[in-house]
Amino acid sequence: MNQTTTYLEFKTDLFANTFFDVIKKYHDYEVCCEGKLWVPFSYFTHENNITLKYSNQHDEELTLVLEKKNERINATSIVKNKYVEDGTDAFYFIDAFQEVMFDAYFLKE
């Protein structure tokens, strides 16, 4: 199991709130990362927390936990690999996820 934690920091909590709302709205988007297509299959939200679960074509599962605190959104991804590699899936997924959400915000909103 590979785990990575990072964060997005915004200038104000208004921007963080807006981006958090975008994630809630577009939580069902697929994420392509490192040649794998991650498809969402579970979504849970409670106050300032969002938990998303994804699976891919290799029967791997990934859990993304997002927590908003003021102008920062903490993101933790946990990948359950069938064959544990170097741990990069978890890190690259967060980057790919951010890109998908930013695209959704700027292209759809």
Task: Mark where each language-model region is.
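Amphipathic, interaction-prone secondary-structure segments
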Residues: 24-28, 33-68
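Amphipathic alpha-helical segments
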Residues: 10-31
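Serine/threonine-rich, low-complexity intrinsically disordered segments
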Residues: 6-7, 14, 47, 52-53, ...
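Mixed-charge, Lys/Arg-enriched low-complexity segments
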Residues: 7-10, 79-109
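Intrinsically disordered, low-complexity segments enriched in small/polar residues
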Residues: 5, 24-27, 41-42, 52, ...
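Intrinsically disordered, low-complexity regulatory segments enriched in Ser/Thr/Pro
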Residues: 56-92
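Asparagine-rich low-complexity intrinsically disordered tracts
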Residues: 2-3, 14, 70
